Amino acid sequence: FAIQFYEILVGFGVAGTGFGVILAVVGRASSQENRAMSLAIATASGSAGQIVGPIVAVFLLESMKWQSVFMIFAVSILLVLLLLPFMRAPERASKDEIEESLSEILSIALKDPSYMMIFVGFFSCGYQLAFITAHFPALITEMSAPIDPAGWCGDLGIETTAALGGFAISVIGAANIVGTLAAGWAGKRYGKKWLLSGIYAGRSIAAAWFILTPITANSVLIFSFSMGFLWLATVPLTSGLVAHIYGVRYMATLYGIVFFSHQMGSFVGVY
């Protein structure tokens, strides 16, 4: 029970420091014209942390126990609090936002087909991401064609299909940073709903192509980069769309509800 209790606390900690809270703060502190790019930078930074974090953890584990490494990461996260005084959100919301209470905004949003489409779309996003993260490496390990030592895999030191599966996840993470920043740049110039539609369509096309193609190192690399480029590109566009439609005053609550659908999709995808 004690272990499960700590796991629950970790879940609350992740929720309290996740995209729902961070993007709301960034969204409120950003101007309308720069909001999409600001949200993209915040999202991409999280992806960069997922790349750098494991490398640092492995380095530290060579010289200390995992408990000490855990405490080092915890303290480093607490140090982020020192940056809070530099965050400058608008002192007051617009007149329209002040006149509408949270209950009124929620009532409007829950009856709005656009909000429901965002909700459903983010559910599918969570399903796709969690499904690939949980099952893609195992699929490559079991189903991929043998590695050619004379090919690019051999040049990178990838000798087994299991290593190729781990490399594929790394490619997804690296491409995700580029794709997220590109989505933020595009969201400033083009309609967010059309960009989101294109991203979801692109994922479907990439998945269909991979399923219908023999699984080789080359197809794994192409699919990993394509899916990685579209991985979290939905986040700055979705959060920016919520802020654009309903304002930033209750963005944390409204985006939190949408992100809840993302997590439900993630659960279904892993299960």
Task: Tell where the protein language model's regions lie, with residue ranges.
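Helix-loop-helix hairpin linking two adjacent transmembrane segments in secondary transporters
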Residues: A42-A89
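Extracytoplasmic gate region of multi-pass secondary transporters
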Residues: D112-A183, G269
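Cytoplasmic helix-loop-helix junction between adjacent transmembrane helices
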Residues: Y6-A44, G247
